[in-house]
Amino acid sequence: MKGSFLATGYPWRALPTLDFYLGIFRDVFPLSKAIRRCGSAALDLAYTAAGVYDGFFEFRLSPWDIGAGILMVREAGGIVSDLDGGDGSFASGNVVAGGPAVHRELLAIIRRHASEQAIERVNPLQAASPEPVTP
């Protein structure tokens, strides 16, 4: 994974995931060339499939954000898994993707930081709405 170009998304729905992400960043950042966020998990996965990124990880995603991207990465010969290394990304919303070597190392780092609370999927249709802004 040394020198890899990675992509991820940042937690925006729940602050408990922030510590989870920061722990991963502390371990991944020194090993990677760069970590980017384009704003779309679908695009990040497409770039991973195309070889622009060497790997991608993000959690608590919705099926419509990852369905096509999972297929693209797999068709390109990459590996996509959930945090258990299994085939449950679509159901769990947790995605780790990349070529075999990057995927293996990235998954090991993420699993060291994983906790049930940090990666529990949030249904965006039931997520708490932000407080209204009053002038």
Where are these regions (language model features)?
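An extended, acidic
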Residues: 1-135
